[in-house]
From Swiss-Prot:
This is Nucleosome assembly protein 1-like 1-A. Pfam families: NAP (PF00956). It comes from Xenopus laevis. GO terms for cellular component: chromatin; cytoplasm; nucleus. The gene is nap1l1-a. Residues 1-37, 346-392 are annotated as: Disordered.
Length: 392
């Protein structure tokens, strides 16, 4: 009987050992998966690994898929026919944009009388009538007596103030309200831009290569003698023969500024610095005066020159890319809608667009937080408590 019990106990012990081994193997597998995840997370935080991965992905961009390569020759011929059709589509699209440019020229002439009147009001050469000044404002429902009282108080305040002419510092305010432009402004630019009277856009004549010119009109001032500063952008609306599929509308090919005739000691694009130099042998010290470039909005009128071969260094290319963006923004947004940038209403519209994107981003963050709650292997970043991660 004892032998039977011992035998049964031995069988049970062996079974228990097998169960234990299975559990240990399972736990070992889980540990391996956890370590693999941790290793992957560490690798993805390594800038060198990310750079190598990005370089590999960049190499794959434009690489034909295996499916395309495996197509029969007769099918590849038909794909080539589709590509030729795509090139013809790009050529038609180029003509479309040329006609759009002609329409812009036509309607610019219709807008100009309104822009001229805007300039007259800003610069106090025309005083708008009562009818022209009426503007429907959304107001809360208040009694007529309160409205009349508020109107009288406002008129009394206006009488106490000195009567300004036109709309002072109109364009300077516009520039300061727009991040793209305010980033270019320096403190020493502001006194000059207070003299800016108007900005106009002129399109190239019919039959001429596509271009547009920005004209900045200044009242007489103590900084330079120019009445008008100009910046011309040359455009092209035709597919590149070497890469026709990259065509996506007109592109700016280059720009030319103008020479600013600065008055003596008023050139804000240059600054004078003094450096002390010590003679190695005699030990004497001398002061050297040197003129160097200075940050200023007015560098906008002296863009880098594009060499004939079209090759630019990285700094010049970055400057021109930003320059083209600014020129396009002035033409498309600032000049047609300047009053709305002056009041900030156009900026609020732009912010609303970004808010929508922000809400989407918030939703994505919420999803990530949910994943963190459900993921037992989630580990917070170094220097951050798990509680802090969930509270953010």
């Amino acid at each position: 009987m004892a032998n039977i019990d011992n035998k049964g106990q031995t069988e049970l012990d062996q079974q228990d050992m097998e169960d234990v081994e299975d559990v240990e193997e399972e736990e070992t597998g889980e540990d391996a998966n956890s370590k693999a995840r941790q290793l992957t997370a560490q690798m993805m935080q390594n800038p060198q690994v990310l750079a190598a991965l990005q370089e590999r992905l960049d190499d794959l961009v434009g690489t034909p898929t295996g499916y395309i390569e495996s197509l029969p020759k007769v099918v590849k011929r038909r794909v080539n026919a589709l590509k030729n059709l795509q090139v013809k589509c790009a050529q038609i699209e180029a003509k479309f944009y040329e006609e759009v440019h002609e329409l812009e020229r036509k309607y610019a002439a219709l807008y100009q009388p309104l822009f001229d009147k805007r300039s007259d009001i800003i610069n106090a050469t025309y005083e708008p009538t009562e009818e022209e000044c009426e503007w429907k404002v959304e107001e809360e429902d208040i009694s007529g007596d309160l409205k009349e009282k508020a109107k009288l108080e406002e008129e009394k305040k206006d009488e106490e103030k000195e009567d300004p002419k036109g709309i002072p510092e109109f364009w300077l305010t516009v520039f300061k309200n727009v991040d793209l432009l305010s980033d270019m402004l320096q403190e020493h630019d502001e006194p000059i831009l207070k003299h800016l009277k108007d900005i106009k856009v002129k399109f190239s004549d019919a039959g001429q290569p596509m271009s547009f010119t920005l004209e900045f009109y200044f009242e007489p001032n103590e900084f330079f003698t120019n009445e008008v500063l100009t910046k011309t952008y040359k455009m092209r609306s035709e597919p590149d023969e070497s890469d026709p599929f990259s065509f996506d509308g007109p592109e700016i090919m280059g720009c030319t500024g103008c020479l600013i005739d600065w008055k003596k000691g008023k050139n804000v694009t240059l600054k004078t610095i003094k450096k002390k130099q010590k003679h190695k042998g005699r030990g004497t010290v001398r002061t050297v005066t040197k003129t160097v470039p200075n940050d200023s909005f007015f560098n906008f009128f002296t863009p880098p020159e594009v060499p004939e071969n079209g090759e630019l260094d990285d700094d010049a290319e970055a400057i021109l890319t930003a320059d083209f963006e600014i020129g396009h923004f002035l033409r498309e947004r600032i000049i047609p809608r300047s009053v709305l940038y002056f009041t900030g209403e156009a900026i609020e519209d732009d912010d609303d667009d970004y808010d929508e994107e922000g809400e989407e981003a918030d939703d994505e963050e919420g999803e990530e937080e949910a994943d963190e709650d459900n993921d037992p292997d989630y580990e917070p970043k170094k220097g951050q408590n798990p509680a802090e991660c969930k509270q953010q």
